Amino acid sequence: MAGAHVKYRHLSRSSAHRQALLRNLVTSLIKNETIHTTYPKAKEAQRLAEKLITLSKRDTETARRSAQGILYTPDQLLPKLFGEIRERYANRPGGYTRVLRTEPKDQYSQAPSAILELVDGPKDMRFAMTAATVARDREQKTESTDLTKKNMDKVTRFRKDGMRAFEDMVASLRDMKFTAGAINPKEWKKLDR
């Protein structure tokens, strides 16, 4: 049927293979809170991850069984999903994940790649980058741009003790005394996120 509306990305796989791929990506996302994959896979996995977190917020027996059918290791991840992650997103109406475009993963595969991450978590990339920008602005004694202020509001709005955690991160980054926005990757490990 030519010209039909595409409801989802097929990812050049059979239906069973595609479902297995997405379940594996979502299981890794819940386990590690961030994954690096291709952009189309990240966007499709994002849809399934959002549904899974919405199920965890319902916290019913039916929701637990549905989540158990999605995750590959439910015995390990259901307590995390229905505990820590459900509490983190209790007040957030949606948008539990974020897709950030990145450079291709290696020089041989030029497929567009992306990072899929859970927002407001300990590995939130936008939170860290916004804090680094604010720390740089304060170090250089310049006013933050409107975009930086908007991002600051976004990353702290639904986070528990958001502004306090953000200011702690900014203080940690200022103590590193980085120059021109460049931070040694070894210094990131010293941050207590």
Curated annotation (Swiss-Prot):
It is found in: Mitochondrion. It comes from the Eukaryota. Keywords: Mitochondrion, Ribonucleoprotein, Ribosomal protein. InterPro entries: Ribosomal_bL17 (IPR000456), Ribosomal_bL17_CS (IPR047859), Ribosomal_bL17_sf (IPR036373). Gene3D superfamilies: Ribosomal protein L17 (3.90.1030.10). Coiled coil: none annotated. The keyword Ribosomal protein applies. One of its GO terms (biological process) is translation. GO terms for molecular function: structural constituent of ribosome. GO terms for cellular component: mitochondrial large ribosomal subunit. Component of the mitochondrial large ribosomal subunit (mt-LSU). Mature N.crassa 74S mitochondrial ribosomes consist of a small (37S) and a large (54S) subunit. The 37S small subunit contains a 16S ribosomal RNA (16S mt-rRNA) and 32 different proteins. The 54S large subunit contains a 23S rRNA (23S mt-rRNA) and 42 different proteins. PANTHER family: LARGE RIBOSOMAL SUBUNIT PROTEIN BL17M, RIBOSOMAL PROTEIN L17. Belongs to the bacterial ribosomal protein bL17 family. Component of the mitochondrial ribosome (mitoribosome), a dedicated translation machinery responsible for the synthesis of mitochondrial genome-encoded proteins, including at least some of the essential transmembrane subunits of the mitochondrial respiratory chain. The mitoribosomes are attached to the mitochondrial inner membrane and translation products are cotranslationally integrated into the membrane. This is Large ribosomal subunit protein bL17m. It comes from Neurospora crassa (strain ATCC 24698 / 74-OR23-1A / CBS 708.71 / DSM 1257 / FGSC 987). The gene is mrpl8.
